[in-house]
C-alpha cells in the first residue's frame, strides 16, 4: 500500500504511528560525559539516551568532558550545519566561573577578538560580567564560532582560568531549566 502522509493514518497494534522526518533532543549534558557517539574509555552523551532513540542521531557540536549544559542531539545534518557553521553567526552563550577579577579591560579584549594560540584568533565575542571578586568572577560569554576548547583558550589569553563552564544557549534554542543534569526532552 502507498501511504499519503498528509491524509492517511497508520496504526500498528491499535497504536497510531506518526511520521517523523527528523528527531531532536535537548540534553542537559553533565560533566564527565564526552560529546561523541562512541568512545572506548568514557561514557558518551548517546549512552544517556534511551536506546529506542539512538539510531542515526549525533551531538550537534561538542562540549568538553568537564563542561555541562545545552547539547542538541539530532539526525538532522542540515540543522547541525546551520548551527555550527561560523559563516552563519549563531550565538552560543556560556556561563563561566573564572579565576581573577574581570573588568572593562577584559570586556574590551573579548570584543576585539583574542589570540588563542596555535596561530588562531577568536572572532569578536561578548563578555558580560555578572560578579567580580578578587579571586573569582562570574561571566556570560557569547561566541559565534566553536574552535577547540575556545572559551578556555580565550580565558587563558586574558590571564584567567575557567573553573566551571556551562552552555546556556545556541541561537534561539535555550537550555530548559527544568531539565536536570543527564536528562533530555
Segments from the language model and where they lie:
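Basic, flexible Lys/Arg- and Gly-enriched helix-loop patches that mediate nucleic-acid binding at interfaces
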Residues: 1-185
Amino acid at each position: 500500500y502507498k501511504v499519503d502522509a498528509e491524509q492517511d493514518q497508520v496504526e500498528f497494534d491499535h497504536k497510531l504511528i506518526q511520521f517523523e522526518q527528523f528527531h531532536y533532543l535537548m540534553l542537559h549534558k553533565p560533566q564527565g560525559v564526552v560529546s561523541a557517539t562512541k568512545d572506548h574509555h568514557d561514557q558518551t552523551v548517546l549512552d544517556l539516551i534511551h536506546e529506542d532513540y539512538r539510531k542515526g542521531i549525533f551531538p550537534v557540536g561538542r562540549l568538553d568532558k568537564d563542561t555541562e549544559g545545552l547539547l542538541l542531539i539530532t539526525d538532522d545534518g542540515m540543522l547541525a550545519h546551520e548551527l555550527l557553521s561560523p559563516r552563519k553567526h549563531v550565538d552560543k552563550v556560556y556561563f563561566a566561573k573564572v579565576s581573577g577579577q574581570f573588568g572593562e579591560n577584559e570586556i574590551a579584549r573579548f570584543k576585539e577578538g583574542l589570540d588563542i594560540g596555535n596561530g588562531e584568533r577568536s572572532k569578536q565575542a561578548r563578555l558580560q560580567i555578572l560578579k567580580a571578586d578578587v579571586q573569582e568572577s562570574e561571566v556570560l560569554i557569547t561566541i559565534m564560532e566553536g574552535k577547540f576548547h575556545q572559551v578556555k583558550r580565550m580565558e587563558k589569553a586574558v590571564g584567567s582560568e575557567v573553573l566551571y563552564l556551562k552552555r546556556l544557549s545556541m541561537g534561539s534554542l535555550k537550555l530548559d531549566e527544568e531539565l536536570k543534569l543527564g536528562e533530555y526532552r
